């Protein structure tokens, strides 16, 4: 979700090597030159852009690029694993939008100031990667071990569920 070029340079080559997997990319920057860069990185896959396709074509595509705003949070429910962008720049984007769908969440190292990311890491529902090798090893483990994939997803979802109602709990403890 909300990927940047350093993120795309990690996950796109991995998916190029795994022909049976499908990818949904929601780039943070949807300028035409950035979309062309993404397209140039993808090899041997049928790629469609959300704004230029039909539901039938999107369902058949190997890669769906979300080239408009406002859809990302609802798109996570179609995935098995989420990669949250920004972790190789100033910081990651929203991890909870993906975790609420009971899926493992992966992100880069610039996540320390984000309490949700730290909580996901501690819960076992979130994973930090620093290199392509980290990402490749983790994705291979998740996709080849269904029990691990499901456990990590359940832990991510449980972490979000634990946060639900936090405002009510705080307000209940405050005497007015």
Segments from the language model and where they lie:
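Nucleotide-activated sugar donor-binding and catalytic core shared by glycosyltransferases
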Residues: 1-176
